[in-house]
Amino acid sequence: MNMFIRRIHLWLSVPLGLIVCIICLSGATMVFDSEITESLNPSIYKVERPEGAVPLQPSQIVEKVHRQLSDTVEVSSMEFSADPERACMLSIKGAEKKSLSVNQYTGEVNGWTESPQFFQTMRKLHRWLLDPPASKGATSVGKVIVGITTLVMVALLITGLVIWFPRTRKMLGNRLKVAFGKGTRRLIYDCHVTLGFYATIFLLLMALTGLTWSFGWYRSLFYDVFGASASSGTATANVSRPSGEKEEKDGQKEFDYSVWNNVLAQLKQEYSEYKSISLEAAQAKVSLPGNMPRTDTAKFNPESGKITGYSLYSQTPRSDKMKGWIYSFHTGSWGGIITKIIQFIAALIGFILPLSGYYMWWKRTSRKRKNAAPRTAGK
């Protein structure tokens, strides 16, 4: 039985091992993409808070942005962080994939946020092998290959764990540590066996959550296992303009941004602690403290700005929470910086495992050929 499992482990790993390397390495590079991006662009994400200064009202910020850019610029949302030294972020209609950074104390435009090309390439490599689908929800050859490889990776991790399981206490001691100073071959073997064991649970977590983006049938099954429905998420209307309007412009009515002033004041009074508050056309979202994504939504009267009701995260159906949970566990953000570091190391080990496996397979086959040569010559 053990020999059969070893053969399954080998036959699955040889053809797809290099793709596993690509998926794991590209995933490792993205663990700290937001931290690296922000550290490379401090003027975009950080502002200096003058002593005794208070942030401008949302309507004042919009007015100053219009003066610097154009009065035709349409602000669709505005995000204020609880960190007084973090810039205010504006979403502009027509610029969906980036935000406009503004100093909330002066109204000065800092510039646009934009993910570095390196991380964009790594994301495409990680998810689609540089072959992204033509549209959201569509499929592509690269997406299918990544999905199949991830399924195989799950099988490799499980069979590898079965093979690792020691028969004696001495074997257990050897398989829990890496032996340095005993040659390259032993070091590579220990890296494959020992480091692979320590990283297995984290690699399985990444693979099992990552598959939800590859296959619809798997996503439905995954949700069912946790008592949720993949298709029962509450649809939220995308309202671009509420009825609290003023002057007409090109046949449409302009949103009165002063409404946001009242909404923001109420939310700051209601929530003593929060990560950020995002103001939108007909609702506001309050991101709650913690590593897991948790958001309360407030509906407000678009004419007066008075909050009329809340949709609390604690009362949200499990099916609506699943996407945030899956992302947090896949990226390692669920436990903060510590779990992200662990996830990064585990992904690097995932990159090393196929390479060390190829090395051991090559050494084993080379030895068999050498042993077979004298027997052939003797005949």
Mark where each language-model region is:
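Conserved histidines in hydrophobic membrane contexts and catalytic metal-binding motifs
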Residues: 1-379
